[in-house]
UniProtKB/Swiss-Prot annotation:
Keywords: Cytoplasm, FAD, Flavoprotein, NAD, tRNA processing. It comes from Actinobacillus pleuropneumoniae serotype 3 (strain JL03). The gene is mnmG. HAMAP family: MnmG_GidA. This is tRNA uridine 5-carboxymethylaminomethyl modification enzyme MnmG. It is found in: Cytoplasm. PANTHER family: GLUCOSE INHIBITED DIVISION PROTEIN A, PROTEIN MTO1 HOMOLOG, MITOCHONDRIAL.
Amino acid sequence: MIYHEIYDVIVVGGGHAGTEAALAPARMGLKTLLLTHNVDTLGQMSCNPAIGGIGKGHLVKEIDAMGGLMAIAIDQAGIQFRTLNSSKGPAVRATRAQADRVLYRQAVRTALENQPNLDIFQQEVVDILVENNRAVGAVTKMGLTFKARSVVLTAGTFLAGKIHIGLDNYAGGRAGDPSATMLADRLRDLNLRVDRLKTGTPPRLDARTINFDVLAKQHGDAELPVMSFMGAVDLHPRQIPCYITHTNEQTHDLIRNSLDRSPMYTGVIEGSGPRYCPSIEDKVMRFSDRNSHQIYLEPEGLSTIEVYPNGISTSLPFDVQMGIVNSMKGLEKTRIIKPGYAIEYDYFDPRDLKPTLETKAIEGLFFAGQINGTTGYEEAAAQGLLAGINAALQVQGKEAWFPTRDLAYTGVLVDDLCTLGTKEPYRVFTSRAEYRLLLREDNADIRLTPIAHELGLIDDARWARFNQKMENIERERERLKQIWIHPQSEHLAVVNELVNSPLTREASGEDLLRRPEVTYDKLTQVAAFAPALDDKQAAEQVEISIKYQGYIEHQQNEIERHKRHENTLIPAEFDYDKVESLSNEVRAKLMQHRPVSIGQASRISGITPAAISILLVNLKKQGMLKRGEL
């Protein structure tokens, strides 16, 4: 049976990638359908109850700057907010929020149900409809076919998912949910490279059986941050602390003595796990010189007794999990509510994707989230947003859009995936970005909101707020330029208390703010420079843009030099076989990856600077040398 209505975009999956992928085209005015196996798990936090962190918080800010949902949802659901690396430079400062799972899921579902142009339908998808090498719809388990002009697949860990607890295993997409076996089988028939990855989750603990009195307490920041540029502190629910315990030698001995019952160490699990979120088995074996690992006990919400022990992800048998938990301080009598487990699932080689996240093999079919080899809610959501945007643009007959590495962490993420691929679950770090001083959390809206406005992704209120902020920044910078303090000034004594070395010549407000020891807050407490802006976001931007102006300009100059070749396009029809001076190995890699630009080609493993020079010469010789906006 074919559904009577034809959609512009169909999104398969209602996780963090799927929700952003569905909201984007709907906001752009396209008729969108979100297909999910269970509407009650829309926006479900399957693993850790937190959003943000190093690199991840940057992604959340970028999603928000483009009108996405994640930051707004966590502002309504965050029960502990912290700014990480607050004592370091602005490039690596990151916001992290502990979440109430129920409140977060409610915020996501409310947003989806109130979004114009978006329909939601509960049914498992078993097939992607492909005609003339183009995705044109999705088929559900009940035999109902939905037709569309583009399809975004965000299946998470559900494709041929297999859950492991000890040496026992069974099919499942996550605990309590079935595996998408039929869809996985169908996708394996397509012209796409597929492999297996693994991830895991710790057991959930009963808070009533934890002795919190003997544990170190960790509070959130006294001055609460917000995640969304449109957010406000009064949107946050009640704030509560987390607690800290540690593994010990008893814990480690138990783990070492149980490896013969571990699915990872007996070869039952073949997929690679996340390097930067290893299981407790891996931590004990890889860091054998350490006799203790820190474990964070994170409440799962305000209305639940469940506690997430961050740091003991495991697939060991249940009796071993009980022993691990009870071996730690404060957890001697703790009960487990849900066992930890590992899950193995299909993912597709992201090198088979265009930077728009459209598959190279099938037109109109976009992939986003964990099926591209990533790990993390934030990475999934960023991909979902990008895939949804490009699915919509394709339907509208408009030029595709994706961010470059110097524009957004989303650009770094996608370029890494599409160019290098991954053999283990990929996560974002600030260290992956060459231009991280320009890709800060605080300026994500300055980088991306004007683009979002052009694409039709943001509403009038956000656009007005953005323009007001930009006016405030410009006006305040100009004001500080115009105010001067000289050696005879009546305010000199107060100013000299702020600076490490007394003023010997006149200085403007901008000059003073460039000094490392002078902050905007301190400067504007001096009568000559008062009053301070009441717009905190604009005030922060004024201080950073002045204090780091020289570094920012240097990095921008670097980008301009790099862009001379970064954006030199390689036409899809370019024939590498005709470039005889390339080695067979280089030629094979270029033909395999089909990079869209010289910049992308230069990041492929094994492609030398000499090979890039040869490519440029041949592009020029064939009259194909042209630069474009990527």
